[in-house]
């Protein structure tokens, strides 16, 4: 029986990519810097000691990172009984954003330039916001800037609740984000507003509109809820997900995968929030998955909760939780199944600012007859999509080189 499980550790980079200088990210290293902080006792909040990832290490994580950076991360060495094939991949796409990374690994790199709102204040054109407000029947909005999602709630959350004005903000990514209180503004109203924004943003070539619902009574307890929703553009070509679906296969999205691909190539969507629930849902879907199925999960917390918030200890604790549960996944796999663990970009929690970092991503592959050992440096994330196409005996993708 042929099944593929893709576990996307959102933002888990393994060292600055070859073109990191273009992005101001030379020296970034999500995995390496987390390991270093843990080894130095600087990440002991909620956990303690060196970073412990024995199962990821057996799958080749430390070796992939060593080949990327030239040295083993602190606390890791070459004394592991490897069971997986490992490599690291350079992104071909022009950006270091979520859609670019996901689409490329499914065989469709983003070779065009996204639109961006580069001004840190007064970020959005008045013509754009006027159209959105008019269609939504709103008399104003807050924000209009680059901001951290948690900080902007502390600064503007109360005013939003008083005025009913939505909070519009952006970042270094190609994104338009809208934060609204679930209780006072309403979740469905927020979703409708995002749909309007998605339509009006078409001429600007913005990759995503993101609904950022939150709850709470004031700055001290405002918190995002699990009802985030991404409104992405469709990939510019058929991904390997589309091809498997067209061939009669199943593609199961766990978490935000369906949103990232604008539902293209998806046959089933499973909602889950948080590392534990996402892992539970992934296991449940693998248990019930039949022949010619992809189960694809995005573990977004690594990015949204720890990377962007520059929470090194939280990131380390999350990785250790994920690692501790990996044996449950391995126990479910048949001999012919293919497991792939990877990332879509970096988000070094020790780096300046709050944005993503341009890094190599790990490519860890297990099963399907693959021999343990190095896959080397992959020239594109699309090698993953090409390998999946080869595995399922689908028509080859235009980009990528199979490692199967």
Curated annotation (Swiss-Prot):
Gene Ontology CC: cytosol
Predominant subcellular localization, coarse grouping: cytoplasm
Required cofactor(s)? Mn(2+)
State any single GO MF term: manganese ion binding
Cited Gene3D superfamilies: Alkaline Phosphatase, subunit A, Phosphopentomutase
Q: What is its EC number?
A: 5.4.2.7
Question: Mind telling me which CDD domains this protein's record contains?
Answer: PPM (cd16009)
- Which residues are noted in the entry as Mn(2+) 1-binding? 10, 344-345
Pathway of action: Carbohydrate degradation; 2-deoxy-D-ribose 1-phosphate degradation; D-glyceraldehyde 3-phosphate and acetaldehyde from 2-deoxy-alpha-D-ribose 1-phosphate: step 1/2
Q: Its catalytic activity?
A: 2-deoxy-alpha-D-ribose 1-phosphate = 2-deoxy-D-ribose 5-phosphate; alpha-D-ribose 1-phosphate = D-ribose 5-phosphate
Q: Where in the cell is it found?
A: Cytoplasm
Q: Could you list this entry's UniProt keywords, alphabetically sorted.
A: Cytoplasm, Isomerase, Manganese, Metal-binding
List the GO biological process terms: 2-deoxyribose 1-phosphate catabolic process; 5-phosphoribose 1-diphosphate biosynthetic process; metabolic compound salvage; nucleotide metabolic process
Q: Which residues bind Mn(2+) 2?
A: 303, 308, 356
What does the UniProt cofactor note say? Answer: Binds 2 manganese ions.
Q: Which family does it belong to?
A: Belongs to the phosphopentomutase family.
Q: Function of this protein? A: Isomerase that catalyzes the conversion of deoxy-ribose 1-phosphate (dRib-1-P) and ribose 1-phosphate (Rib-1-P) to deoxy-ribose 5-phosphate (dRib-5-P) and ribose 5-phosphate (Rib-5-P), respectively.
Q: What is this protein called?
A: Phosphopentomutase
Organism name: Shewanella oneidensis (strain ATCC 700550 / JCM 31522 / CIP 106686 / LMG 19005 / NCIMB 14063 / MR-1)
State the encoding gene: deoB
């Amino acid at each position: 029986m042929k099944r593929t499980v893709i576990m996307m550790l959102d933002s888990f980079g393994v060292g600055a990519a070859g073109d990191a200088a273009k992005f101001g990210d030379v020296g970034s290293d999500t995995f390496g810097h987390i390991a270093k902080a843990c080894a130095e006792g600087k990440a002991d909040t909620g956990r303690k000691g060196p970073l412990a990832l024995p199962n990821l290490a057996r799958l080749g994580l430390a070796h992939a990172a060593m080949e990327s950076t030239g040295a083993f991360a602190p606390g890791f060495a070459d004394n592991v009984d490897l069971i997986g094939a490992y490599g690291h991949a350079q992104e071909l796409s022009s950006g270091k954003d979520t859609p670019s990374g996901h689409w490329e690994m499914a065989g469709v790199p983003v070779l065009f330039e996204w639109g961006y709102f580069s001004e840190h204040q007064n970020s959005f054109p008045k013509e754009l916001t006027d159209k959105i407000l008019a269609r939504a029947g709103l008399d104003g909005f807050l924000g209009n800037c680059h901001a951290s999602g948690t900080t902007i709630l502390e600064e503007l959350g109360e005013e939003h609740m008083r005025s009913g004005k939505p909070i519009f903000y952006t970042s270094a990514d190609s994104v338009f984000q809208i934060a609204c209180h679930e209780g006072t503004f309403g979740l469905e109203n927020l979703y409708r507003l995002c749909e309007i924004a998605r339509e009006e943003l078409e001429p600007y070539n913005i990759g995503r509109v993101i609904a950022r619902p939150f709850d709470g009574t004031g700055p001290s307890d405002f918190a995002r809820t699990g009802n985030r929703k991404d409104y992405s553009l469709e990939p510019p070509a058929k991904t390997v997900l589309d091809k498997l679906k067209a061939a009669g296969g199943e593609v199961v999205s766990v978490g935000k995968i369906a949103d990232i691909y604008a539902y293209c190539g998806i046959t089933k969507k499973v909602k889950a929030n948080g590392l534990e629930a996402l892992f539970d849902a992934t296991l449940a879907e693998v248990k019930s998955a039949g022949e010619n199925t992809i189960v694809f999960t995005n573990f977004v917390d690594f990015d949204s909760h720890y990377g962007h918030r520059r929470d090194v200890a939280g990131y380390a604790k999350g990785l250790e939780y994920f690692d501790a549960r990996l044996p449950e996944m391995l126990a479910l796999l048949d001999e012919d199944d293919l497991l792939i663990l990877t990332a879509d970009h970096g988000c070094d929690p020790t780096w300046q600012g709050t944005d993503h970092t341009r890094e190599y991503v790990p490519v860890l592959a297990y099963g399907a007859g693959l021999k343990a050992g190095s896959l080397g440096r992959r020239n594109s994330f699309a090698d993953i999509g090409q390998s999946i196409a080869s595995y399922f005996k689908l028509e080859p993708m235009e980009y990528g080189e199979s490692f199967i």
